């Protein structure tokens, strides 16, 4: 392992990370091209010496800081020692890494080192964005002679608190191999470049929210007073103020090719909004959060539809989840359902205040349309067919609404330390005979979607103003890595 042996500043560390990463990526691409064109195998001795490896970032603390900050949710050491991780795409993560390093460098006097690791970059992750042209017949040979993805080396043990103490402590929740794995999946599922993702995320489970988001987004990028400068759409479409007929340029066929298409309303400072249509079901919700978490978003909110479970609710009312009954089952092995998922005060307050502001219902009046309570998330699309069992469970939990995604998203936020929240809109009341019918559904959608989406956007504006205060200490484990 190469060691420069000098204490780097955060800026120097980032420059060195980018330098080492680019060296490895270029070497791997050149070796692949030489193999494809000439059949030349990579030099095994050069590989042993780190020809294709990720750079590693290490931060050491001697425990001498007299008064380490206790109120921050990140940028803290739990004990003296050396913390390390491997890094991929340092240019993409530069702002994030710089923020984290500056905190420990200035507050703790931490020692920062950058060197080459022993973990090789899998070849599939360097092909995109290069001039390499490969066909399927080459796959077996490349897998045999070049580093490739090994699932045994990829996991969420650190995020789940399952890592085994050793010589080094983990510096971050995700190492380079885990990050690269998810970056590739994000592009595949959403149809957009990972560079376009914004830190404030809205999830929805209905395409009509997408239509409204696109309409509003296009109006924003034409407004000279708006901070939004572009709209990145699933299928590789990029809309700016110069785009003629922007809504017509966004093809339905483009996003329909992707399982969970995304749209990114971009700001010049990278503090915009991403909307992901996750479709229906907890499996999709888990999948997108597994991969989106590596980008370390500032918040994700579920803005979708639900079934109202209380007689006093009306179609079009809102539900602000403050607790979850997790009948989704997709996370039971890593986060048992008896583990409580706490609500995040800052997020709850933002969603509540945004609902008051957008609906125009001040003070106590907003409670006529906004119900706070427990949301059930189920993995059974036809839960109504087991009415006797379902009704008893709903009654015991005091649930006010049911859907198929919200608890999964909240649980994933809890796992990955991403602030989370849920504001749902009642689209039917199956326990009280008000079920979805085609004509009723259309009238409901037309009246509710615009306001509901605007509440989500307004909540993001409020949360953006919170800055680092948005991140909650209640999501920290006992041995939390220093980086957010």
PLM ranges: what are they?
Residues 1-299, 307-484:
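Accessory terminal and edge-of-domain segments that mediate assembly/interaction
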